[in-house]
């Protein structure tokens, strides 16, 4: 073959030489044409020859791959390339597509290294042309493919493990893994979250100074690193706010130290002595490992050998952390399902802020708030450092903020609550992360942490932000800034796979947004409210829309959702109660508001049978708070029918009792919305005692505020508290009141003037019987059903309580036959205001042999019958224990009864939440010399001023007559001032003139107050409520944080 090739080459060369030689002599044109054709044919023949030679050489080279390589292979390749004019294709199609080096020609007939590693089919195709496209998209496709394979492996974990256990090789692998992990189990580690603004958590000053001077007189590396970290102008951030994808050199010095330790501890061979003798890993002295969410995965796996979590000075063992994690998943997550979590260590590796937030929330179920109080301030600081200083690239941060919004951190005043700011922060972070764009989130960030079912939980988080903002906007009376987008609309229509409760709550939140936009976003008025004349028709349409939602979604199938649904109804009615709304539009919603509010309180009492109040999310507690406040307003107005007044009053008392009915440690150690609501009710009740005219001076239900949307109700009531305080220090007002009293004629029920009737309120304003503690030995409950169908439960003192109260009064110098003033610290004036007792009941004609009178359900008893009613003592509790009053008292709802009320004390004995450790305070213990009053117990600390003002009773006069007893609390009289009794007498005369003593068929008869109504005889209950007022301090009644040092006092 080589001979033929050479001969052909020689012929071609000779022919080319002849053709290239110049022509000799003259020839014809035909000869020239023939010559040119010959040259063309020769060129074609040479090209064909070259292609055949190239194909033959390729075959020869391929055939030679199976054996040893020829030493002249490179020379042949160069000859072939020079002969063909282009390089032969030696790379496979995959390597040509990615433009990477390929060794397919060297590995033939095997695949190239990359295709063999990737499991791809390797082929050489000279006709293949690389496709032009985005390498990033290809990488995304590969990542999705890997994720699919990983999910398949995870789902097949059980099959793989069983297969490994059934094979010899698998058992050997498992045994090797156990041997490798066994030394790590002997040395646990503690992971710590550092706070930048607390350098003592990194290392204290003393430890830094002591570690600077080493025994050799030089500086240790760790001391230098820590001191350098402490002197930085910007402190290092060693939590979720650490920058993402940072290299080691750009990290803070202390974090570099932790990484150095971590890498050395894991890279040290197990057999070396240092791994066993290092004191840092011993159980006694454990070196903290700094774990960050986004910088690098410091924890080897979700099952890392962690035995302690540290934040500041709080140490949580792994067993306690697992317990709290289980409590959160079981009790709290169903209320707000925006995340999923399986293990504590995995949760910590995902986000430290989310981990500590879950630990804090689960601590609400502890019997004592010790751990909760220790974590609260630290987590607030951690949230600020994580979110404000740098922008975290994780959805977990938004989830943590939303959890803090639903179970708020402790706060005393409304403006101190960070929840609304946390909602806004979570919303802004989610915007930056692209949570509002779902699958297009990659267009916003490429450094976000990954999680299983990422798009599902990101969407849940975005929906949770929408709900939380609507809830907190309604609480504070602020307009919502969220708008309905694609995800909210799809969720509302049921296109997403959401839990039923969460779907219903989102629908109600969407309705709240529509309600606020329609009624409170007008550009025609400065307060933003719709024109008063148009409110009625708009509210009617909104009420029909809410009824339609209820018929479709069945809100009443879930008590939690039903409470929030009724809260949405109360929001509609509140818009109707705003100033300038026509009276007809207001009155038509009064009864509906009463029914909705009392239903909320009934549902709460049922829910608290198996759940503590503090475990409920804010949207449930706000529904109850709003119901109590609107009932307080309604029961003072003439628009509420008389048959509902007693039930409304008792509903308010029930809320107050439940809100004060927490475990002693929680009631005294934590201030939040629960304690604030109870305090607001107590302050309002004190205003009802001292300045009741404030509530009836203006026409309408809500009369003084108007620009807070549905939150106007709360601010209108708070205004009454501040106005009462202003009048208390206003001497001009008191002088004018005294002048009006002197000019006012004395009126009786029969001779009342028309002018007096016009100026007098239309309804008596009685105080509410709030109390903090009661024992079954002193009071028993009697339930009545009025002709209007309202169930009313009253407290009736027992025979033993009355005897002990009389004994105590006589020991203090009281005269025989004088009516008693209080029983176990509860003023009888308050019980008398609700029809519980009669003046004759506490007289000296009490006979122990008086039988118990039956209480008719169809008609209220006559005063004489009530006077003779002495209920028997209830049976003692099992084990001889007595429980305080602040336990919810329940009864089963009767048919066609709109309210559920308290039952007898025997029912309360079976309730789950008890405080057996509290000392028992009864009337007998008080009579025997126990100076503690009802509110002097640890359940509600006695004010310091009350302790100072307690004085022993003066001795009797020589002539045998008892000395005149001083007022129980002189400071209260000082606060009320010299004109207080005159003002109360003036107000009482107005009430008597406006409300003649006529029997009311819908209400139980009220006994004449007599001396019991005198203001100086109020017991410690009112002293406790007025503690801040008496001390001249506004801190206790400044619920909003309005008072400022620069504010004018007349404001």
UniProtKB/Swiss-Prot annotation:
One of its GO terms (molecular function) is DNA-binding transcription factor activity, RNA polymerase II-specific. SMART domains: GAL4. One of its GO terms (biological process) is DNA-templated transcription. It is found in: Nucleus. Signal peptide: none annotated. Residues 11-21, 206-218 have a biased composition (Low complexity). SUPFAM superfamilies: Zn2/Cys6 DNA-binding domain. The keyword Nucleus applies. This is Putative transcription factor SEF1.
